C-alpha cells in the first residue's frame, strides 16, 4: 500500500512538472508573437494520401515530386540527432513525417521543433516518399507549431484511468483510441444512410417540438422545465409521435424525424436519459408493411455502412440479408418457458400466478395484458438473439396502436429484438378518435393510481383524429442501440459522445 501511494505521488509530481514546463514554453511563444497562429492551410488528409499513394513505389513518388500540406496532432517523435520521425494524427488517421535539420529554415529544428511536446498540433509541408521499410511519409520542408498543448497525451501517464474518464473527457478518448473514433464515424455514416433510405422511399424529413405542454407518444416519466415568459411548466419530449401523426392528418403522407428524446429514467448499459430515435409514419399502410420496410432498412444499412449484410456482435453473427424471425408474444413465452400452458395467459388468475412465480411484482393497476407483457419480458426478451419480430401486443400496453380486427384485446403492433435487446417498435396506428379518447382516459386513471409513466390526455390530438387520420403505420427505432449493434459495442455509453454522468464532487 505504501509503495502504491508513493508511486501515485511520484506520478502526480511528474505531471505537475510537465504542466509547468509546457506553460513556460507557452510564455515564450507569446513573447515571440507565435503562440496560436491562424494562417496555416492544409490541402491533404492522411487517409486520402494513404489510399492514393500507398501502392506506389518510392521511385515513382520521387519522379512525381508530389508536395502536400498536412496538419494534425503530434502523437510520437523519434529524435535521432539531426533528423527525426514524427507520427501526425488528423481526422483521417496517421501519417509519418521525416524532419531533417538541414531541410528546414535555420533555427527551426533545434530552437523550436526539439522543444515541442507530444500532443502539440503541427502544420507540415513537404514531398511524399517511402522509407526503407516502405512506409508512406512526408519529407518536411516546412514545419510550424499551430497549437501548444498544455497537457500531455493521456497514454504518457498510464493512459485513461478508467472507463468513466473516457466518457467524462471524451476528447481524450478520441485522441487516444482509434476504436472510439471509428465507432463515431460509423454512427455518422448510419445516420446519413438512414436519411438516404428514407428519402429514396418517398419520406420527408421534419422537425417537431422538443419542448411540449403535454408529453405524449410513449409511456415514460418526462423531464419538467419552466418557460419563464409564458409562466408555464413544459416537458422535454419523450417521443415525437403525436406531432408526426398530426402532420399525416394535415396531408404529409410519409414523414420521418431523427432527433433526441428525453426520459427521466435510470442509466444502464441500454439506457441513457437523452437518446436518439428515428420515427416514421406512412399513410395507407399497416404494421405488415412496416415489417417489410424494417427488413429492407437493415439490409440496406448494413450493406451501405459495413459493406456486408452480416454483422458480428460478441459471439453472435446476424445475417440481415434474410427475413427476421416472427413470433407472437404468447408463442415467445411458451418457447422460452416451455412449461407454460398458452391458455393460462388468457386467464387473469393463472397469469398472475405465473408472474408471481417469476418474482414479478404486480401493481394494482395492472390488467391481464400488462401482466402477460411482464411475463414476456422476464422469460423471453433476453433470449431473442437473432433478429425477431414479436407481434400481438396487448391493447393495455399499446394505447396508441390499432386494435386487431379479430381480437380486440390485442393490437396490430410489433417490437423487434436483436441480441436480446429491443431495437424498435411499430404498429398500425389507432385512427378511431373515440377509441383514442377512451384509451387516454384509461391512461389518466392509471396515472391517478400511481403509474408515473402513464400518458397524459392530449385533447388536441384527439381533435386532430376527429378531422381524419388515414390508415397509417408508424415505426420507431433506437439509433443508439442500432449503432451498438453495428460497432459491436456492449454499453450505450460507448456510442453516445457525451453520455449522462453523475457530476464529479
UniProtKB/Swiss-Prot annotation:
Cofactor(s) the protein needs: Mg(2+)
The EC number(s) this enzyme carries: 6.1.1.6
UniProt catalytic activity: tRNA(Lys) + L-lysine + ATP = L-lysyl-tRNA(Lys) + AMP + diphosphate
Binding-site list for Mg(2+) 2: 422
Any Pfam family matching the protein: tRNA_anti-codon
InterPro entries: Aa-tRNA-synt_II, aa-tRNA-synth_II, aa-tRNA-synth_II/BPL/LPL, Lys-tRNA-ligase_II, Lys-tRNA-ligase_II_bac/euk, Lys-tRNA-ligase_II_N, Lys-tRNA-synth_II_C, NA-bd_OB-fold
Co-factor binding details: Binds 3 Mg(2+) ions per subunit.
GO biological process, one term: lysyl-tRNA aminoacylation
Listed PROSITE patterns: AA_TRNA_LIGASE_II
Keyword vocabulary terms for this entry: Aminoacyl-tRNA synthetase, ATP-binding, Cytoplasm, Ligase, Magnesium, Metal-binding, Nucleotide-binding, Protein biosynthesis
Localization (cell): Cytoplasm
EC top class named in words: ligase
Gene Ontology CC terms: cytosol
Single Gene Ontology MF annotation: ATP binding
Family: Belongs to the class-II aminoacyl-tRNA synthetase family.
Subunit comment: Homodimer.
HAMAP family tied to this protein: Lys_tRNA_synth_class2 (MF_00252)
Protein name: Lysine--tRNA ligase
Organism: Pectobacterium atrosepticum (strain SCRI 1043 / ATCC BAA-672)
Gene: lysS
Amino acid at each position: 500500500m505504501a509503495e502504491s501511494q508513493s508511486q501515485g505521488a511520484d506520478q502526480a509530481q511528474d505531471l505537475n512538472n510537465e504542466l509547468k514546463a509546457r506553460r513556460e514554453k507557452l510564455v515564450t511563444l507569446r513573447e515571440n508573437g507565435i503562440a496560436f497562429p491562424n494562417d496555416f492551410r492544409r490541402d491533404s488528409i492522411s487517409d486520402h494520401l494513404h489510399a492514393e499513394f500507398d501502392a506506389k513505389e518510392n521511385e515513382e513518388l520521387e519522379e512525381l515530386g508530389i508536395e502536400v500540406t498536412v496538419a494534425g496532432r503530434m502523437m510520437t517523435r523519434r529524435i535521432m540527432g539531426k533528423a527525426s520521425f514524427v507520427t501526425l494524427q488528423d481526422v483521417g488517421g496517421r501519417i509519418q513525417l521525416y524532419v531533417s535539420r538541414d531541410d528546414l529554415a535555420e533555427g527551426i529544428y533545434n530552437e523550436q521543433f526539439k522543444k515541442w511536446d507530444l500532443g502539440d498540433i503541427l502544420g507540415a509541408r513537404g514531398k511524399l516518399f517511402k522509407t526503407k521499410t516502405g512506409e508512406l511519409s512526408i519529407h518536411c520542408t516546412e514545419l510550424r507549431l499551430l497549437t501548444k498543448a498544455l497537457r500531455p497525451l493521456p497514454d504518457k501517464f498510464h493512459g485513461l484511468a478508467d472507463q468513466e474518464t473516457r466518457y467524462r473527457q471524451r476528447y481524450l478518448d478520441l485522441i487516444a483510441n482509434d476504436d472510439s473514433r471509428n465507432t463515431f464515424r460509423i454512427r455518422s455514416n448510419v445516420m446519413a444512410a438512414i436519411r438516404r433510405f428514407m428519402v429514396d422511399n418517398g419520406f420527408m424529413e421534419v422537425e417537431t417540438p422538443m419542448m411540449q405542454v403535454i408529453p405524449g407518444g410513449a409511456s415514460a416519466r418526462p423531464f419538467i422545465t419552466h418557460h419563464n415568459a409564458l409562466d408555464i411548466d413544459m416537458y422535454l419530449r419523450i417521443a415525437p409521435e403525436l406531432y408526426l401523426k398530426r402532420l399525416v392528418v394535415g396531408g404529409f403522407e410519409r414523414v420521418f424525424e431523427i432527433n433526441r428524446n428525453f426520459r427521466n429514467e435510470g442509466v444502464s448499459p441500454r439506457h441513457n436519459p437523452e437518446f436518439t430515435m428515428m420515427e416514421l409514419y406512412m399513410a395507407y399502410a399497416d404494421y405488415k408493411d412496416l415489417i417489410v420496410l424494417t427488413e429492407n432498412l437493415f439490409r440496406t444499412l448494413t450493406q451501405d455502412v459495413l459493406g456486408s449484410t452480416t454483422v458480428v456482435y460478441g459471439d453472435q453473427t446476424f445475417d440481415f440479408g434474410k427475413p427476421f424471425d416472427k413470433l407472437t408474444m404468447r408463442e415467445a413465452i411458451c418457447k422460452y418457458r416451455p412449461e407454460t400452458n398458452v391458455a393460462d395467459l388468457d386467464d387473469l388468475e393463472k397469469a398472475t400466478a405465473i408472474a408471481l412465480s417469476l418474482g414479478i411484482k404486480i401493481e394494482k393497476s395492472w390488467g391481464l395484458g400488462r401482466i402477460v407483457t411482464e411475463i414476456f419480458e422476464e422469460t423471453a426478451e433476453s433470449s431473442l438473439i437473432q433478429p425477431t419480430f414479436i407481434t400481438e401486443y396487448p391493447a393495455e400496453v399499446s394505447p396508441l396502436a390499432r386494435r386487431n380486427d379479430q381480437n380486440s384485446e390485442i393490437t396490430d403492433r410489433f417490437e423487434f429484438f436483436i441480441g436480446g435487446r429491443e431495437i424498435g417498435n411499430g404498429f398500425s396506428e389507432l385512427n378511431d378518435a373515440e377509441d383514442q379518447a377512451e384509451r387516454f382516459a384509461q391512461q389518466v386513471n392509471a396515472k391517478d393510481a400511481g403509474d408515473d409513466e402513464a400518458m397524459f390526455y392530449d385533447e388536441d390530438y384527439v381533435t386532430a383524429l376527429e378531422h381524419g387520420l388515414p390508415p397509417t403505420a408508424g415505426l420507431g427505432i433506437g439509433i443508439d442501440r442500432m449503432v451498438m449493434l453495428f460497432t459491436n459495442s456492449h454499453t450505450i455509453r460507448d456510442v453516445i459522445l457525451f453520455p449522462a454522468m453523475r457530476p464529479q464532487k
